[in-house]
Amino acid sequence: MKLPRDLSGQQLVHALNRNWEYREVHRVGSHIILQTEVPRHHRISVPDHRPLRIGTLNAILRSVAEAKGVTRQQVLASL
């Protein structure tokens, strides 16, 4: 599955909130800090840019997949 080319940081935050139990902890400049406790503590920083760069999006998806114990493709399909 190809990565979306027009996904904004805010859209990614919303999808991670809705589908993967991440919640916004705070903002630092143009970055949104998200955190989850399920299945273990994990914190990520999502830039609030429009659109997100492909490498940045790929790194965030890989990090979420590793923390949740699923594949990157499963995380990507939920966007």
Regions found by a protein language model. Give the residues of each.
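Basic nucleic-acid-binding interfaces
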Residues: 1-79
